[in-house]
Amino acid sequence: MQKRVAAIHDISGIGKCSLTAALPIISAAGVEAAAMPTAVLSTHTGDISGFTYRDLTGDMPAIAAHWKSLGIRFDAVYSGFLGSTEQVNIVSDFIDDARSGECVVIVDPAMADSGAMYKTFNSDFAANMARLCKKADIIIPNITEAAILCGCEYREPVHLREYIESLLHGLSDYPAKAVVLTGVSFDGGSIGCAVLDKSSGDISYVFSKKLPGIYYGTGDIFASALTGAYMRGMSIAESADIATRFTFSAIERTYIAGTDPRFGVNFEEGLGAYINMLGE
C-alpha cells in the first residue's frame, strides 16, 4: 500500500524550498505527500526583499480536523520551518493525533544558522521547538540548531570529529531513534552530514564536494529526499546518503549553469536519478 506523509511547511512561490520542494521530491519516491501549508509567500525570505506573506496559522487546526473527520491516516509527519510558537503547538497536537496509528515523525527544527537564531525567534521559541523534537523519531538539525537543542557551544567549521560527536551524543538524550546532523565539515573542501542511529549506536558520515556560494532551499531538499527514501524502506544511513547525493547534484547543476542561487537550485532535473537511487 502506498505510504502517505503529512508535509507541514510554508509555500514560497519562488525559491524551490519548503512545500515546493517537499511535494515533488516525496512524490518522486512514490510516497503520497499531503500538504498542510503554514503560510504563503511570494518568495522565500533569504536575501530577497519585498516578499509578500500571508499567515495560515488559523487554518491549520481546521485542516487537521477535516482530515481527521475523513479518517485520513498518515505513515509519517514531516515538519519544517514553523513561524511561531502557536504553529509549533498545533503541529505537536497533530502529531499526537497521528500517533494513534503507526506514524514516523520527522522534524527539521528550522530556527537558526551560522551560530544565531533567526531574527524572528527567541529562546522561548527554541524551548518549544525542543519539546516538539522530543516527539520526533528523526531529527534533522544543522550545527547551530543542534547546539541550541542540547545546550552546547556553537563552533564554526571546519569541525573536529570530537565536537560533532559531542553534539550527537548531546542529542541522544532526545527520544528520537535517529539524528541526522547537517552542515558538517572536517575540511574546507567538503560538507555533509553525520548520522546517529540510536538502535545500533553507530555514527556514520556522508560528504560531498563543497562548491562556492550560498544555495537557498538545500536544507529542505535534503530533508525531503531523506524522508522519501526512509519511507521507501531505506535505513537512516542509506537515506542520508541518497539525500546527500541528490542535494549535491542539484547544487552542482545550478553552479555549472550560473543561475541566481537566490531562486533555488535545479533539483528537478535530478528527480529521475533520485528515483533510480531508490531502486539501487
Predicted regions, residues:
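Short pre-catalytic strand/loop immediately N-terminal to key active-site residues, enriched for Gly-Thr
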Residues: 13, 203-217
